[in-house]
Amino acid sequence: LAAKALPAARYAVASSFSQPVRTGWADLLLNCFSPFAQEEFLRVLRPGGRMIYVVPGAEHLYQMKAVLYEKPYKNPVQQIAYDGFAAIGEREVTGRITVPHEQLEALFAMTPYYWKTPRGGAERLAALSQLETDISFRFLVFEKL
């Protein structure tokens, strides 16, 4: 979709830990809900290049966790610092969504909860006709030093 909207731009989808670009090539990296590959990000970003790192906010999918677990938990919110980067901004975006039954399994499969939820929790989720849940995204902006 992005390539169609801005055909003059260049896009790549790859492993965070082995990106198919030359050293110092990127002006901007976007890393959504993926591991922080610090060495690779430092390699591919030009000096002064920026990275937007998207992590879950405290209440992200909290109501889903309330279905899955006996004791649901909030995501930890912490200040994050990485060598070689300066934190230059942060914004949190929150909302509430209603996920119909047909899309619940796909959403569940995109989360780390899919791999560690007891069978009973997964069965409770699968039995729902829909799920109304909070979403919360933290956009952390860093600049390469």
How should these model regions be labeled?
Residues 48-61:
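Conserved beta-strand signature within the Rossmann-like core of class I S-adenosyl-L-methionine
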Residues 58, 65-87, 93-145:
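Conserved Class I S-adenosyl-L-methionine
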Residues 17-29:
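A short acidic, Gly/Pro-enriched loop at the edge of an enzyme's catalytic core
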Residues 33-47:
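A short, conserved alpha-helix within the catalytic core of class I
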Residues 12, 88-91:
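General small-molecule cofactor/ligand-binding pocket signal
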